């Protein structure tokens, strides 16, 4: 099942008990965050606040608050099925020629999907049913959430920022938070390595002093939203990838003020420009780390046009100490990463980004170890293979007999298979998340790798312990007589 717009997905969630409408007036200032946070921690439904205090537009929150809803957005019921998305991405990143006739036949579905890649341009798009421009633009009329008591101002959180660089054929979609600065101004908080910032940098070099056109889409269809947070190949547009996932071309329309294309069924579109040199201090804001971050200067986005659907819905979220919505997205997207990593490193059994680690700051990887030093090779590969793991501070490598998603198993492996000096890798002066105030320098810090695998000859001179495992035949005999023993519940093994 694919969803043409956000509204059809909302209807689907509601029909399946995954969305709750809240008619009681709720204030976007702090109250929505408190309600959404309580519901998310209880693994509850998405929320549609129908009567935001002081505003006329309803607010959608916790849309991707469980891995199940992320899977549902892609027409799947089980988050594990998201590995199909990872298989597709692995194919796109490194397509291989067929190894024979059968292999060629097996790849036909992927090549057919590729036909859905180019976006489809439409006219009379729903996102442009209502248009205001110039002096009529007033962003304070939107129900923009003020999430935490220490936040400096309301914050746009789920906007898809659309940019294009002079050297790129594709348009880039990225999600960057945007501080409300005035009736027609937002602060565009994009870090230097992100796609939008790189496009802007290239534009300034080729067109010095010129205004840079930018568009922000709020409330796009769920597949396009997820396409913007998925690690697509650098040369591919998120629109093209969304078309692949959906099985239908992404519908776009030309923006009102520039040549950028916007998701045609979006709820709200903000169009405008960045004036080179116009900067403003951004923050502080409560972030996904669970702390308020430092302030810094970022470009100012001047909004010249606001268009939206009739009876538009404002899509929002909050970030805070995990679990939050980004952490739940991370749990779901974890399954996307597994096939991508396995294609490059077939020895990887499983890969886990614990949500407690702010979605990406720690990774645990289980491998089929094949030679001394193998764990260290996988560490280095994981740090360098995907840009998404550039900020991963800690990597733990375990053997295939350890469930890398079970801390009981992982801690057992660390405490029985590791020597802190021999099996710890420390690397200084590496890229680190700008928001990580624990690093000695903003954006630059260290990484730690932990080899919690069994040690081979060459890694130790000691006789290595053999794990205790019950005889399989005995286990089967006990399984057969368990009900006769009068013990209420058999433990899950």
From Swiss-Prot:
Q: What is its EC number?
A: 4.1.1.98
Which reactions appear under catalytic activity for this entry? a 4-hydroxy-3-(all-trans-polyprenyl)benzoate + H(+) = a 2-(all-trans-polyprenyl)phenol + CO2
Supply the source organism for this entry.
Shewanella loihica (strain ATCC BAA-1088 / PV-4)
Q: Which gene encodes it?
A: ubiD
Q: What is the protein's name according to its record?
A: 3-octaprenyl-4-hydroxybenzoate carboxy-lyase
Q: What is the lineage of its organism?
A: Bacteria, Pseudomonadati, Pseudomonadota, Gammaproteobacteria, Alteromonadales
| Family matches, as InterPro entries | UbiD, UbiD-like_C, UbiD-like_N, UbiD_bacteria, UbiD_Rift_dom
Q: Which GO terms describe its biological process?
A: ubiquinone biosynthetic process
Checking NCBIfam families in the record gives: PRK10922.1, UbiD family decarboxylase
Cofactor list: prenylated FMN; Mn(2+)
């Amino acid at each position: 099942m694919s969803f043409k717009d956000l509204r059809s997905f909302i209807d689907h969630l509601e029909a399946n008990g995954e969305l709750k409408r809240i008619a009681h007036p709720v204030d976007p200032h702090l109250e929505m965050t408190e309600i959404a946070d309580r519901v998310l921690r209880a693994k509850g439904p998405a929320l549609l606040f129908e009567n935001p205090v002081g505003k006329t537009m309803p607010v959608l929150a916790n849309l991707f608050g469980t891995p199940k809803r992320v899977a549902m957005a892609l027409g799947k019921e089980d988050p594990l099925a998201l590995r199909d998305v990872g298989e597709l991405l692995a194919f796109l990143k490194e397509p291989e020629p067929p190894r024979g006739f059968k292999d060629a036949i097996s790849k036909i579905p992927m090549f057919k999907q590729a036909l859905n890649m180019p976006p489809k341009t439409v006219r009379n798009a729903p996102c442009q049913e209502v248009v205001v421009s110039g002096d009529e633009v007033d962003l304070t009329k939107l129900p923009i959430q003020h999430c935490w008591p220490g936040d400096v101002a309301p914050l746009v959180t789920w906007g898809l920022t659309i940019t294009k660089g002079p050297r790129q054929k594709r348009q880039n979609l990225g999600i960057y938070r945007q501080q409300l600065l005035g009736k027609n101004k937002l602060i565009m908080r994009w870090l230097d390595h992100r796609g939008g910032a790189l496009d802007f940098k290239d534009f300034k070099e080729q067109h010095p002093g010129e205004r840079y056109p930018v568009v922000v889409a709020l409330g796009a269809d769920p597949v396009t939203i997820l396409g913007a947070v998925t690690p697509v190949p650098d040369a591919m547009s998120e629109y093209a990838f969304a078309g692949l996932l959906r099985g239908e071309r992404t519908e776009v329309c030309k923006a009102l003020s520039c040549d950028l294309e916007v998701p045609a069924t979006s709820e709200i579109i903000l169009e405008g420009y960045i004036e080179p040199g116009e900067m403003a201090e951004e923050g502080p804001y409560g972030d996904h780390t669970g702390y308020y971050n430092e302030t810094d200067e970022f470009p100012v986005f001047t909004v010249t046009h606001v268009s939206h659907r009739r009876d538009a819905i404002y899509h929002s979220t909050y970030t805070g100490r995990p679990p939050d919505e980004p952490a739940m997205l991370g749990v779901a997207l974890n399954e996307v990463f597994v096939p991508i990593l396995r294609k490059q490193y077939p020895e990887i059994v499983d890969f886990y980004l614990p949500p407690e680690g702010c979605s990406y700051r720690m990774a645990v990887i289980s491998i089929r170890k094949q030679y001394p030093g193998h764990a260290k090779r996988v560490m280095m590969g994981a740090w360098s293979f995907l840009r998404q793991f550039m900020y991963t501070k800690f990597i733990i490598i375990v053997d295939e007999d350890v469930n890398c998603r079970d801390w009981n198993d992982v801690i057992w492996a660390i405490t029985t298979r590791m020597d802190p000096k021999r099996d710890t890798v420390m690397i200084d002066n590496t890229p680190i998340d700008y928001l990580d105030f624990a690093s000695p320098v903003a954006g630059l810090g260290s990484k730690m790798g932990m080899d919690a695998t069994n040690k081979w000859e060459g890694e130790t001179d000691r006789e290595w312990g053999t794990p205790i495992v019950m005889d399989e035949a005995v286990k089967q005999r006990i399984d057969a007589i368990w009900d006769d023993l009068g013990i209420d519940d058999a433990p899950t093994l």
